[in-house]
Amino acid sequence: MKLSIITINFNNLEGLKKTVKSVINQTWKEFEWIIIDGGSTDGSKEYIVKLNDELTHNGWNPITYWCSEPDKGIYNAMNKGIVDANGEYFLFLNSGDSFVDKDIVADFYTTKYCEDIVAGDIIVDGSELLARQNPDEADLDYDYMVKSSIMHPSSFIRKKLFEKFGYYDENLKIVSDWKFFLYVLIKENCSYAHWHRFVTDFATDGISENELSHPIIWSERKAVLDDFLNRYHRSIEKRDKRIYEIDLPLFTIIKRRLINKINKFFSEPLCNL
């Protein structure tokens, strides 16, 4: 089993250095690393060039691909990383985020998970007092995903999910990873495991943690959920038109209740954005 670590960066040199240190200090060296820089002007590109040369000179270089060029946003950058990654599992460790210790990759290999998504836990800005935990398997359902999410920075995702269901939606600015989890885990019923281990030290300087971004998050989530319900509606019709016609009144009631539930959730603060 091979792991691909994908790091996205844009004008965050100090955060990138923190991420790099935690990656190259991993005790288990059998992984590949893809770094996608969005054409930074703060010295990040020069730092990546120097890092790549030094790792090659020292005889161990996990960087299999890197680039520094303008992109169309964070999900466009992530999709670039997906295209060039060859591991069985992907982990997105973006600049500013870091592994909580040097044995994360080793422990992931030795646990021998086989689920489609393996979600570890995170600490926040170096503090376990601000820890966030992913749900246990029995707690992960549609209601959970409406009001919360799987934490992306500590989730190991099988490559085949992107190949089968598509990449991140680049039309969304903030919630495309949440949309991906919603569709593959709830609609497609892909397998999931909660790894009860702190994996990532999450930096709260990203766009999703900015309070000014919350209206965008709510708006994008509502649009995704509306599309999700409409797709479910169409899938019933396509699967069995006769049963669909018989159950249409019931479906209408269920849909109305779900919409009311969604509206209720979105009138309250969201967590784990």
Predicted regions and their residues:
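N-proximal low-complexity "stem/linker" segments adjacent to membrane-targeting elements
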Residues: 1-25
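Cell-envelope/extracellular polymer assembly enzymes that use nucleotide-activated donors
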Residues: 1-4, 32, 179
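Glycine-rich, basic loop-to-helix element that forms the pyrophosphate-binding segment
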Residues: 19, 68-85
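A conserved acidic beta->alpha catalytic loop
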Residues: 29, 37-48, 94, 98
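Short aromatic/hydrophobic "clamp" motif used to bind/position activated sugar donors
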Residues: 90
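Conserved donor NDP-sugar-binding/catalytic core segment of glycosyltransferases
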Residues: 98, 102-131
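Conserved nucleotide-sugar donor-binding catalytic segment
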Residues: 132-224
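Membrane-proximal basic amphipathic "stem/tether" segments
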Residues: 229-273
